[in-house]
Amino acid sequence: MQWDVIAHGYGLVEGPTIAPDGSMLFSDVLGGGVYRLGGDGDLDTVVPKRRGVGGLAVHAQGGVVCSGRDIVHVDSYGNTRTLYHRDGIAGWNDFCTDASGRVYAGALRFAVFDPNAEAVPGELWRIDSEGSAEIVGDGVVHANGCALSPDGNTVFLSDTRSRRLIVFDIASRKRNDVDVSAYGHPDGMAIDDAGCVWLALVSGGIGRFTPDGALDRRIDVPSSITTSVCFDGNTLYATTGGHSETPELAGCVLRTQVDVTGAPVHPATI
């Protein structure tokens, strides 16, 4: 499989998201900032300096929704509005949106980059357009990648520390914890039209898992740390961390073509 490097020179790249105009948004968790890569290769800073952005979404009114210490909306003019804040949460990591524009977000209860921090489990929350929020599932040590099934009935969440892919049935609140430790540490994810999960596996490339959590195939990525993925039609993008034997592949955005199409991703309305 041929991968093309389309952006590089960052720290820990996360949150790849395709905007309505076809440009791509991504964040640098450690270096700070949210960036837009245009189809012509031009690169713009959308949100300067903001660190800890593990998830991004386009907002229905324009601008971008970012995670971090809280969840914010940065509009097209650069104005920032806090959408949701909750005391006791160290930060919000990756998130996804449903067809109504509600946000499903993983809450972190400890500083994940502090090796001495006690790994206190967090939760998966759903944030509604009125600003209310509720817990969908708990006992998630290190909430990371998050995505919804095409029918909106199931939310998938990766737990990096415990190496689990968690499958939540939204209506019943039942869950299925799938052990993916044999393949690597799970990180960001995307869903294809068949409902399969394309899961970034740190030190393990990308795995395509069926909706019930069975591994269907693996894809090699030319970097030692794969952090997240997203689709634009049958184009697959992957992001990487800041360590690689090849400097160009550290903290970069990669692109390739695959034989499936990504499921629709909805704008946020909260």
Regions found by a protein language model. Give the residues of each.
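Sequence/structural signature of beta-propeller modules
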Residues: 1-2, 251-270
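A short beta-strand motif characteristic of beta-propeller blades
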Residues: 2-7, 41-48, 79-86, 132-138, ...
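Beta-propeller domains
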Residues: 25-44, 72
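Short loop/turn segments that connect beta-strands within beta-propeller blades
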Residues: 37-41, 75-79, 127-131, 169-173, ...
